[in-house]
Amino acid sequence: MARLHSGKRGSSGSTRPLRTEVPEWVSMSAEDIEAKIVEMAKDGKQSAIIGNILRDMYGVPSVKLVTGKSVSSIMKEAGFYTEVPEDLFNLMKKAINLRNHLENNPRDTHSTVGLKLIESKIRRLVKYYRGTKVLPAKWRYSPDTARLLVE
C-alpha cells in the first residue's frame, strides 16, 4: 500500500501464517498470559508494546489465538485502557514533540509541513472515532488539549 503523504510505494511485508489452533510449543496458559498483560499494563505499557514483549520474550505468537481475546480487550476488562485510542494518542505525542521543536527552531519549514500533515491525520482519525462512537461527538482536537492529555 502506498504512503499517505508522498508519491512513494509502500514496502511489502510478510503475512502471519494462518493458524486455527495454539501451537504446541507455547508454554504459557491463557490465565498466565492475561496476568502478564495486566501486570505490564500496570507499568504503563501500551498494547502494541505488550504484544511485542509477549512475542519476543515469552514465545506467544498470537494472544488472540491463545486467550480468545485481544490485548486491548484484556486491558479494557482490567480497566487499564485509555479513553483516547492508542494510535491517536501516539500521533498527538508526535505533534506535541514537533511543536516543541518548532518553538526552538521557528524557521524549520520542513518540520512545519510535517506538523501540518500529522495534524491532518489526527483530524481524520478523530472524525473516524467520532463516527464509530469511540470518542464523544463533541470531542475536538486542539494542541492545548492534546498537550494536557499527553502530559
UniProtKB/Swiss-Prot annotation:
Q: Which GO-annotated molecular functions does the record name?
A: small ribosomal subunit rRNA binding; structural constituent of ribosome
In which domain of life is the source organism classified? Archaea
- Ranges for the region named Disordered are 1-20
What Pfam families does the entry give? Ribosomal_S13_N, Ribosomal_S15
Which UniProt keyword terms apply here? Ribonucleoprotein, Ribosomal protein
Where does the chain cross the membrane?
A: none
One GO cellular component term noted in the UniProt record for this chain: cytosolic small ribosomal subunit
GO BP term, example? translation
Q: How does it associate, per the subunit comment? A: Part of the 30S ribosomal subunit.
Q: Which NCBIfam families match?
A: PRK08561.1
What family is this?
Belongs to the universal ribosomal protein uS15 family.
Provide the protein name: Small ribosomal subunit protein uS15
Which organism does this record belong to?
A: Methanococcus maripaludis (strain C7 / ATCC BAA-1331)
Q: Give the classification, highest ranks.
A: Archaea, Methanobacteriati, Methanobacteriota, Methanomada group, Methanococci
